[in-house]
Amino acid sequence: MDVTRLIDLFPYQLEKFPKSDALAAKENGVWKKYSTAEVLEIVNNLSYGLLNAGIKPGDKIGIISNNRPEWNFIDHACLQIAVADVPLYPTISEHDLKFTLHQSEVRYMFVSDKVIYDKINALKPELPFLEKIYTFNKVEGAAHWTELTEAGKKAPLSEKVNEIRSTIKPSDLATIIYTSGTTGNPKGVMLSHNNLVSNFKACEVLCPFNDNWRALSFLPLNHVYERMLSYLYVYYGVSIYYAESLDTIADNLKDVKPEIFVTVPRLLEKVYDKIVSKGAELSGIKKALFYWALNLGLRYELHGANGWWYEFQLKIANKLIFSKWREALGNNIVAIASGGAALQPRLARVFHAARIPVLEGYGLTETSPVIAVNNFQPDCIKFGTVGTVIDKVEVKIAEDGEILCKGPNVMMGYYQNPEQTAEMIDAEGWFHTGDIGIIEDGKFLKITDRKKEIFKTSGGKYIVPQMIENKLKESRFIEQAMVIGENQKFASAFIVPNFSFIRDWANRKNLKLDTNDEIATNPEVKKRIAEEVNEINKTLGHFETIKRFELLSREFSIEKNEMTPKLSLRRKIILENFKEQYNRIYSFD
């Protein structure tokens, strides 16, 4: 059979490579595994239960949950009865939650735990369409999701489900994924079966997938990149193991020993910083060897371009030092897929040197999501780029530098928002990404900035903040940065120090810095970070250099609405929240 709709995936897996561990998650400290046949049985019973409860094709169902097999069960149960699911972030604000559930007219909600249940239940009187909330964990007084599977077993509507399945076309709506932009209300991105199927089939070039592989999943499944790759895993018979939480990833990696996982650059940065901090604690020959290997890795070039002597040294570094990095990831990693934000080239280099290929990709929710990706095909990796454009997708660079995309991955449109759909997809079918980029070497796409985030100084010079911020974040001393200076004489920055790294650094220098405030106001810290900024300034044009900066005593956060759930900066809100620091920078002639 061929897979043309998402509902074909598990039947295809059952036919081609039935698995004993199609999905797995820890329950009471033990891995509970679901075979392909069990997954299909649960999905069917859920579909029967939903139909018995009065859910019908065209309805919407919401999901707010951590990653777990139940997420997949609900997703596939909805898909095969032509019900679109609306997945949302657990960290969603109350305003955005009310807006999305109201606009999409969600009838049933499925939530992971008591905290989210209480949050939604409190809003229920304001949500006229919401009829029932089911939980995955047992919550006193709440309906449990298994009530639906039990009802489905008692009244199996297999004929009804098969009848609906037979009417579902690849072009039909599969899901509505809300994107929380840096301004305004969230937009509901409508993706069809074909949008997602075409995307995961085109991403098979990412690496040589194998039905003996295991994937560890921890990025939220409502993030379209993790979700699309989860469909790809099912298609290739890769077993999906769900991490217990972000805090247990290190233990779960050693336990599961996966060949692949998806991550965002920020998590890789934290892994790298932790490795470097541990290396800094070593002494004598061990410390010297660690830094020798690290500096070797940071100079890594593909295809042996550094010559035989470098490659010979790298072999030794891999045996002595980098082998321990691979062990920490379970010792089986073939590829790490990175997306959602720009990956620092130095991270790509050092992990590749350590035989841990980190493959950066690029796309948006509106493009299902992948447009381009570094991959295992010959000569299809280039550090500092997001790789080559995937099969059946076209990219062109507009006159103003904006990246335009056309192909089967481009969304159906924004839900109940034809005006914004027309703004984003032009009459010729080109989707306007809002990102600025160039094509290097005739095939590699490189992102240089967000179109809307570029600003002018009072001298009329254009500043590309994201590029400068990424350079600043390459420093081990800097956790976050935001470049400012619109309509001012010069560019400056808000800098959030890497508090844990600086505490270790301070201890080695016998400096007592207990609190974040002490770190942000300490002259020694400011002086050391100024050295980092000056080094970065040497790589920038004169008008781009950071003339002044303020150290902040806390990180930008989703809770304070300063970042989207995808960790994009909400610049206006950050400026408002740090007005005092801004005024200190620009309160002179």
Q: What is the meaning of each model-derived region?
A:
Residues 455, 480-484, 489, 505, ...:
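Conserved C-terminal "lid"/linker of ANL adenylate-forming enzymes
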Residues 18-21, 135, 153-178, 185, ...:
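Conserved pre-ATP/AMP-binding loop-to-beta segment of ANL
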Residues 197-214, 221-322, 332, 357:
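Conserved AMP-binding/adenylation subdomain of ANL enzymes
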